[in-house]
């Protein structure tokens, strides 16, 4: 996973929709 997705959920769910659940928990 990408830890930077925590403070950058915008590019996270935008680049990885599968990790969207990880960011939003």
From Swiss-Prot:
Record's keyword terms, sorted: Ribonucleoprotein, Ribosomal protein, RNA-binding, rRNA-binding
Entries under InterPro entries matching the protein: Ribosomal_uS19_SF
Keyword Transport: no
A GO MF term: rRNA binding
Transmembrane segment boundaries: none
Record's GO cellular component terms: ribonucleoprotein complex; ribosome
Region feature Disordered, mapped onto this chain: 1-25
GO biological process: translation
Family: Belongs to the universal ribosomal protein uS19 family.
Reported function: Protein S19 forms a complex with S13 that binds strongly to the 16S ribosomal RNA.
Protein name: Small ribosomal subunit protein uS19
Organism, scientific name: Acholeplasma laidlawii
Lineage: Bacteria, Bacillati, Mycoplasmatota, Mollicutes, Acholeplasmatales
Gene (name only): rpsS
